[in-house]
Amino acid sequence: MRAVVQRVSRGEVSVGGEMVSSIGKGFVVLVGISIDDNENDVMYMADKIVNLRVFEDEEGKMNLSLLDIGGEVLLVSQFTLLGDVRKGRRPNFMMAQKPQEALKYFNLLVKEIEKRGVSVKTGIFQAMMKVLIENDGPVTILIDSKKVF
């Protein structure tokens, strides 16, 4: 499981010109689910997202988590994060999970983040979305549950 975590002052998802989800301060998380992901990857990712300390404390130091600031998550499925461009010029998406299985893990990730005390909004799975990301910083963190980077 791979995620791009962006600290935001706000985020929105629109489908077909209509806003379907929005958050204030927190994270917009773009997540790609791999063919070899399982529940352990979901738990790892949920813990990292909820406890990542990238919000500034009273001294300006990145020391606070979503839990500490009462932040929200806008979780957006993005299979293209699994694209392999090592060969050729067109991405190979062979490592991306099939949609039905990916949706199962995506929904589990939503539940696990919420279970840890953070509000989660989502885009619409498999829809063509417009994602508004108002970066705060900017602060962008890459997380891979297989610890590839």
Curated annotation (Swiss-Prot):
Cited function: An aminoacyl-tRNA editing enzyme that deacylates mischarged D-aminoacyl-tRNAs. Also deacylates mischarged glycyl-tRNA(Ala), protecting cells against glycine mischarging by AlaRS. Acts via tRNA-based rather than protein-based catalysis; rejects L-amino acids rather than detecting D-amino acids in the active site. By recycling D-aminoacyl-tRNA to D-amino acids and free tRNA molecules, this enzyme counteracts the toxicity associated with the formation of D-aminoacyl-tRNA entities in vivo and helps enforce protein L-homochirality.
Gene3D superfamilies associated with the record: D-tyrosyl-tRNA(Tyr) deacylase
Any single GO CC term annotated in Swiss-Prot or TrEMBL for this entry: cytoplasm
One term of GO molecular function: D-tyrosyl-tRNA(Tyr) deacylase activity
Record keywords: Cytoplasm, Hydrolase, RNA-binding, tRNA-binding
Subunit and interaction comment: Homodimer.
Name recorded for this polypeptide: D-aminoacyl-tRNA deacylase
Superkingdom of source: Bacteria
Family: Belongs to the DTD family.
Biological process terms in GO annotation: D-amino acid catabolic process
Chief place where the protein resides: cytoplasm
Reactions listed under catalytic activity: glycyl-tRNA(Ala) + H2O = tRNA(Ala) + glycine + H(+); a D-aminoacyl-tRNA + H2O = a tRNA + a D-alpha-amino acid + H(+)
EC number: 3.1.1.96
TM ranges: none
HAMAP family: Deacylase_Dtd (MF_00518)
Compartments it resides in: Cytoplasm
Domain notes: A Gly-cisPro motif from one monomer fits into the active site of the other monomer to allow specific chiral rejection of L-amino acids.
Entry-linked SUPFAM superfamilies: DTD-like
UniProt gene name: dtd
Pfam families in alphabetical order: Tyr_Deacylase (PF02580)
Short motif (Gly-cisPro motif, important for rejection of L-amino acids): ranges: 137-138
